[in-house]
Amino acid sequence: MSLGILGKKLGMSQLFDDQGRAVPVTLIEAGPCRITQLKSADTDGYAAVQIGFQLIREKLINKPSKGHLAKSGNDLLRHLREYRVENSSEFELGASITVDDFEKGQKVDVSGDTMGRGFAGYQKRHGFSRGPMSHGSKNHRLPGSIGAGTTPGRVYPGKRMAGRMGGKKVTTRALEILKIDTNHNLLVVKGSVPGKPGSLLNIRPAKRVGVSIQQGGE
């Protein structure tokens, strides 16, 4: 299945494998999502499927979005995402996308917004080494030189300096699904994913899952 699913990060936990080793996992409440729009190459120039996630009260949604969802006969949904497909006619408008569409052991790419850290300094943002902390030192957490005077006489673009940290879209690739709970719409994936508990996640089948290398002769 080429479609992804939207979900909410619940937090992290751990599972134990057959050897008794603790494996860090992330719990994701994924779906159910509804197909809200089908796009085709004839009408839109490309084939895609749009899905919606998370019910929302009528007072919290604008009229254009309300009318868009009414065309597909869906309830009011907060989040909409679109996925490119080869043939959108294979899907049905209003159909549900659930965790049943994924398999245990499948690799997925998970996208989300990282936790915002606000305005951060050189050590926290870039991992710079600090200066001496002893008495008499005037350089504790300063960045050091940011450029020469006469030549070039300016700060080069891209120079790592203090500034806003976090709050960016990040994708963690090829995470393995270790467990699926269909009763509670849960995906349990190995490792960590971007964002804090409660943040929106986009889970898609992995684009790159690695290449197996044949050992020995043919």
Swiss-Prot record:
Q: Where is this region: Disordered?
A: 127-167
Extract one GO BP annotation from the record: translation
Which InterPro entries does the annotation name? Answer: Ribosomal_uL3, Ribosomal_uL3_bac/org-type, Ribosomal_uL3_CS, Transl_B-barrel_sf
Report the SUPFAM superfamilies cross-referenced here.
Answer: Translation proteins
GO molecular function per UniProt? rRNA binding; structural constituent of ribosome
Keyword Zinc-finger assigned: no
**In terms of domain of life, where is this protein from?**
Bacteria
| Leader sequence residues | none
The record's similarity note reads: Belongs to the universal ribosomal protein uL3 family.
PANTHER family reported for this sequence = 50S RIBOSOMAL PROTEIN L3 (PTHR11229), LARGE RIBOSOMAL SUBUNIT PROTEIN UL3C (PTHR11229:SF16)
This one is known as Large ribosomal subunit protein uL3
Q: State the species of origin.
A: Prochlorococcus marinus (strain NATL1A)
Query: Which gene carries the instructions for this protein?
Result: rplC
